[in-house]
């Protein structure tokens, strides 16, 4: 028995691949990885000991491109699929798991050509174009969101690393706010943090701001100009996001699925700013259920005024009839919404099929 893991491009997809690879290693199952030279795949897995072999193809995404660029991207995908077909055959792969993203294309199609059972993890509440096409052909599609076309869909807990649960805590007071711009940076969140920093620091609230590598120097300059650089924690990115979340009492973040469920597992109340240009507006739908259950606050990017932060803080500090703060209630309920061992459940379901 030997697995191939494929997909990525962004940290959200890759964090799932990592969680599944860790579980395969625990189960004593060998795995190889197939991804792309474009995006973050090599950065995550080029030297990863989780895989016996790693392959990266010259591929790019197809959606949101001009006609001629789409043709070129499709050509690269097809070319890579035939290479992947030979690789899967060479390694005698018995199961393939796709975590989505454009880099999953070649190995997913190669698996179908080689009659290898294909399993898919759909991380978002709205399927990406590749997963929409491949889902009917897959052995099973795992997701933490319920889809109308149930078919071969398996509802499971999101494959979050156990450390997010291990370092979870129930928040009682807002003393520390995390602005999570992500590894790529989010201009709207960076500006939101900057505009609120003077008032927050004056109130004695600590700030940790992860702004992305492209914006780091600019953010350093602006905080320096405000005289706040030595009063806040500013990072381009952070290698230990679990520790950063653990220390925070409130977060401001985009609504990528992995971030949503990691914050949930950690019990960290969050203001989500869905990326407005995400395909099919999937970031909004990723947190729609949370919003309906009063487990988060969602602010559209075009409504992101500085006063919104303090409006949310006031709401979180309000108490119910029993004297419990909304902050504490939400924090506790978040930890109940997601179960541990999502990756383990997925792998064991596949192994027992």
UniProtKB/Swiss-Prot annotation:
Which residues are UDP-N-acetyl-alpha-D-glucosamine-binding?
10-12, 124, 183, 283
Where in or outside the cell it occurs: the entry states: Cell inner membrane
Q: Does the keyword field hold Cell cycle?
A: yes
Read off the Pfam families from this record: Glyco_tran_28_C (PF04101), Glyco_transf_28 (PF03033)
What enzyme class is recorded for this protein?
Answer: transferase
The residue range of the signal peptide is none
List GO terms (cellular component aspect): plasma membrane
Keywords, A to Z, come to:
Cell cycle, Cell division, Cell inner membrane, Cell membrane, Cell shape, Cell wall biogenesis/degradation, Glycosyltransferase, Membrane, Peptidoglycan synthesis, Transferase
Say which domain of life the source belongs to. Bacteria
Q: Name one GO molecular function term.
A: undecaprenyldiphospho-muramoylpentapeptide beta-N-acetylglucosaminyltransferase activity
Q: Which GO terms describe its biological process?
A: carbohydrate metabolic process; cell division; cell wall organization; lipid glycosylation; peptidoglycan biosynthetic process; regulation of cell shape
**InterPro entries referenced in this protein's UniProt entry, alphabetically:** GlcNAc_MurG (IPR006009), Glyco_trans_28_C (IPR007235), GlycoTrans_28_N (IPR004276)
Question: How does the protein's chain sit in the membrane according to the entry?
Answer: Peripheral membrane protein
User: What is the reaction catalyzed?
Assistant: di-trans,octa-cis-undecaprenyl diphospho-N-acetyl-alpha-D-muramoyl-L-alanyl-D-glutamyl-meso-2,6-diaminopimeloyl-D-alanyl-D-alanine + UDP-N-acetyl-alpha-D-glucosamine = di-trans,octa-cis-undecaprenyl diphospho-[N-acetyl-alpha-D-glucosaminyl-(1->4)]-N-acetyl-alpha-D-muramoyl-L-alanyl-D-glutamyl-meso-2,6-diaminopimeloyl-D-alanyl-D-alanine + UDP + H(+)
Which pathway? Cell wall biogenesis; peptidoglycan biosynthesis
EC numbers for this chain: 2.4.1.227
Give the primary localization class. membrane
- UniProt function note: Cell wall formation. Catalyzes the transfer of a GlcNAc subunit on undecaprenyl-pyrophosphoryl-MurNAc-pentapeptide (lipid intermediate I) to form undecaprenyl-pyrophosphoryl-MurNAc-(pentapeptide)GlcNAc (lipid intermediate II).
Q: Which family is annotated?
A: Belongs to the glycosyltransferase 28 family. MurG subfamily.
Its protein name is UDP-N-acetylglucosamine--N-acetylmuramyl-(pentapeptide) pyrophosphoryl-undecaprenol N-acetylglucosamine transferase
Q: Which organism is it from?
A: Helicobacter pylori (strain P12)
The gene for this chain is murG
